[in-house]
């Protein structure tokens, strides 16, 4: 089981004034009894209203991180943290998609199988006049030293 993170001290992305205003409106809309809390079902609906569609796993992770008292109800400050966590997860998903796109462009497969030639990576860097020491990067990433990079090796190289 993953360690519980103190998300109130965690470095989460800031929300813009517009995003905070949308959070207030969405929270108020779903806090029908004015109790200052919404339940998990209402949380999913509120997130959808804000254009966020987390998976069941994402919902579980977010709720377990913000529901400090285990009430299964979310207060406004916890709701804001949920939005921040979801925003952070979305950014990570976008980064993963960019990595996969680059892997495929270099010869890998969409299902993260296949491999890319280190020589092809080197020639692309040279073609775009990138001042990257490919050999030094690959030395750490190409674990089996076979001149190819698997998806995991390529992702490690970019991180």
UniProtKB/Swiss-Prot annotation:
Compartment(s) of residence: Cell projection, Cilium, Flagellum
CDD domains: EFh
Transmembrane stretches, start-end: none
Domain EF-hand residue range list: 18-53, 54-89, 129-159
Lineage: superkingdom: Eukaryota
GO cellular component: dynein complex; microtubule; motile cilium
Keyword entries, A-Z: Calcium, Cell projection, Cilium, Dynein, Flagellum, Metal-binding, Microtubule, Motor protein, Repeat
PROSITE patterns hit by this protein: EF_HAND_1, EF_HAND_2
Gene Ontology terms, MF aspect: calcium ion binding
Residues that, per the record, bind Ca(2+) 2: 67, 69, 71, 73, 78
Subunit structure: Consists of at least 3 heavy chains (alpha, beta and gamma), 2 intermediate chains and 8 light chains.
PANTHER family linked: CALMODULIN LIKE 3, MYOSIN LIGHT CHAIN 1, 3
The protein's name in its UniProt record: Dynein 18 kDa light chain, flagellar outer arm
